[in-house]
């Protein structure tokens, strides 16, 4: 029923506004205002629910967007803090790795020095042993040479100092020494 009344008022207002071309301007202004009020009333009547629904939906949508933006901001803050924490952990692990690497390198260096010293000591011992062996060989050769020379000298002395008479006496003494 309300719809019919409003529609009738609209039609009437439009017809009055259109008929009075010769009327004064105040009447035209009045009917324009009436038409505007009627138009706004019709828009409100027919579209009020939809407009309210749209505006409420828009308000809720904006509120949800604000809440979502706040949540995203909080999440990004948490992610930033987490990234900072992970960066600090990575720095700490890197420092620990460097420290361990330096300690390992130092131990390896000391171990290498110790092994080199042991090898040098073994080489010294082998050299001393080789020198001692060579000295003994040289002494043996020298003794052999000295014995050979002594024999040669003795032989030549004996041959030059022994004559047949001395030779017979020596043979007799040796035989007597063997018999006894």
UniProtKB/Swiss-Prot annotation:
Membrane topology type: Single-pass membrane protein
Any Pfam family: ATP-synt_B
GO cellular component, one term: plasma membrane
Alphabetized GO MF terms: proton-transporting ATP synthase activity, rotational mechanism
InterPro entries per record: ATP_synth_b/b'su_bac/chlpt (IPR002146)
Membrane-spanning ranges: 26-48
Protein origin, superkingdom: Bacteria
Keywords, ordered alphabetically: ATP synthesis, Cell inner membrane, Cell membrane, CF(0), Hydrogen ion transport, Ion transport, Membrane, Transmembrane, Transmembrane helix, Transport
Family from the record: Belongs to the ATPase B chain family.
Subunit structure: F-type ATPases have 2 components, F(1) - the catalytic core - and F(0) - the membrane proton channel. F(1) has five subunits: alpha(3), beta(3), gamma(1), delta(1), epsilon(1). F(0) has three main subunits: a(1), b(2) and c(10-14). The alpha and beta chains form an alternating ring which encloses part of the gamma chain. F(1) is attached to F(0) by a central stalk formed by the gamma and epsilon chains, while a peripheral stalk is formed by the delta and b chains.
HAMAP family named in the record: ATP_synth_b_bprime (MF_01398)
Protein name: ATP synthase subunit b
Organism in which the protein naturally occurs: Sulfurihydrogenibium sp. (strain YO3AOP1)
Lineage: Bacteria, Pseudomonadati, Aquificota, Aquificia, Aquificales
Gene from which this protein is expressed: atpF
């Amino acid at each position: 029923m309300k719809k019919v009344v409003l529609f009738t008022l609209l039609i009437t207002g439009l017809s009055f506004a259109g008929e009075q071309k010769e009327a004064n301007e105040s009447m035209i202004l009045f009917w324009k205002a009436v038409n505007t009020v009627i138009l706004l009333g019709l828009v409100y009547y027919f579209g009020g629910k939809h407009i309210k629904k749209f505006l409420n939906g828009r308000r809720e949508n904006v509120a949800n967007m604000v809440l979502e933006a706040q949540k995203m901001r909080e999440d990004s803050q948490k992610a930033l803090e987490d990234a900072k924490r992970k960066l600090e952990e990575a720095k700490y692990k890197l420092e620990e790795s460097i420290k361990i690497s330096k300690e390992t390198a130092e131990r390896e260096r000391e171990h290498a020095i110790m092994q080199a010293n042991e090898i040098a000591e073994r080489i010294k011992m082998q050299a001393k042993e080789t020198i001692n062996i060579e000295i003994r060989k040289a002494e043996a050769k020298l003794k052999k040479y000295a014995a050979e020379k002594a024999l040669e000298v003795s032989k030549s002395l004996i041959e030059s100092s022994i004559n047949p008479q001395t030779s017979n006496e020596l043979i007799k003494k040796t035989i007597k020494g063997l018999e006894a």
